[in-house]
């Protein structure tokens, strides 16, 4: 399929080609992909879902900028027989407590919309998208955006906005969400990103399908990996019973392994890498393949080492 914008357009079902808010939302995805950067895996999503932070960021950004560019906080989707039904929400509405956080599309759209309305905010948002967000070594999320935005805004100008969605002030946020932790059904105080400079991870790296499909929170676990010197590096993930799957990225670009050995419960991926910072996205292979049982939690011991 050729590159472009593909819009739903079936009469008496969903005629998005007449919904300005959706047209600009989809155009914003195109902008993000071509001029900024999107690490989102895509997929189905709805307001209230607990999403992979890359998905929450991309979808919330697109809705916020659609409203900002139209000068209208209302987002309207017409559908149904003779387009007689509609779904409406406002990006200007602060999310309820249970829907506040880096995993919430509603939180992201609220924050970006509010930031765009601050003095100098619209320009700062666009500049950040074209610079820091495009080039961040972290996975794209509200954290990488906030870290890039903060120096462009007056001190403290964004604090209320981030507080409204349950996050610390932008001045304390780094691109990796280092000052933030959250609670899952299997653990509390979970960091947003696991960090492994070298050697063995101090704690198991865990994933879960409790929130749903592949693009939901905790289905993929980001791990920050440092490569201080070019050469061959190996990631070993050992499960108690499950087999891991790992995809490695540098600045959003997938890095293919030169060798992969997957003999349950051990995965060994070897890479030829340049010096720099990388992000590994780890999941349970059965979750990736669609064969996992519901409400599955899997944990892995992870080791990162230089081979040669």
Set out the residue ranges of the language-model regions:
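Auxiliary, metal-adjacent structural segments of Zn-dependent hydrolase domains
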Residues: 1-3, 7
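Short pre-active-site segment immediately N-terminal to the catalytic Zn-binding motif
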Residues: 7-23
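Extracytoplasmic/secreted cell-surface and envelope-processing proteins
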Residues: 15-16, 31-32, 39-42, 289-291
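Catalytic glutamate of the conserved HExxH
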Residues: 22, 26-34, 60, 64
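C-terminal edge strands of extracellular/lumenal beta-sandwich accessory domains
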Residues: 178, 182-196, 221-226, 247-261, ...
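Short proline/glycine-enriched turn/loop motifs at strand-loop junctions of beta-rich domains
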Residues: 229-231, 239-243
């Amino acid at each position: 399929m050729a590159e472009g914008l593909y819009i739903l357009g079936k009469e008496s079902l969903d005629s998005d080609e007449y919904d300005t808010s959706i047209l600009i939302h989809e155009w914003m995805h195109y902008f993000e992909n071509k001029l900024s950067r999107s690490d989102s895996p895509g997929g189905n999503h709805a307001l209230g879902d607990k999403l992979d932070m890359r998905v929450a960021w991309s979808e919330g950004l697109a809705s916020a900028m659609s409203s900002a560019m139209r000068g209208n906080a209302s987002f309207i989707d017409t559908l149904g027989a003779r387009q007689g039904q509609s779904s409406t929400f406002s990006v200007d509405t602060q999310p309820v407590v249970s829907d506040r956080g880096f995993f919430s599309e509603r939180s992201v759209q609220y924050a970006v919309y509010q930031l765009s309305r601050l003095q100098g905010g619209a320009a700062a948002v666009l500049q950040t998208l074209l610079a820091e967000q495009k080039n961040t070594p972290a996975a794209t999320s509200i954290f990488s955006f906030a870290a890039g935005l903060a120096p462009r805004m007056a001190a403290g100008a964004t604090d209320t906005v981030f507080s409204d969605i349950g996050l610390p002030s932008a001045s304390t946020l780094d691109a990796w969400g280092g000052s933030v932790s959250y609670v899952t059904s299997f653990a509390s105080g979970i960091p947003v990103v696991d960090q492994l400079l070298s050697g063995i991870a101090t704690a198991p790296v865990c994933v879960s399908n409790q929130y749903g499909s592949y693009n939901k929170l905790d289905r993929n676990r980001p791990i920050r990996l440092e490569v201080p010197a070019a050469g061959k590096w190996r990631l070993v993930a050992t499960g108690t019973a499950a087999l891991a799957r790992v995809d490695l990225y540098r600045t959003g670009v997938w890095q293919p392994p030169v060798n992969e050995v997957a003999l349950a419960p051990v995965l060994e991926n070897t890479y030829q890498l340049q010096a720099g910072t990388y992000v590994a996205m780890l999941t349970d292979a059965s979750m990736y393949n669609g064969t996992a049982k519901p409400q599955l939690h899997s944990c892995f011991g992870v080791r990162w080492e230089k081979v040669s």
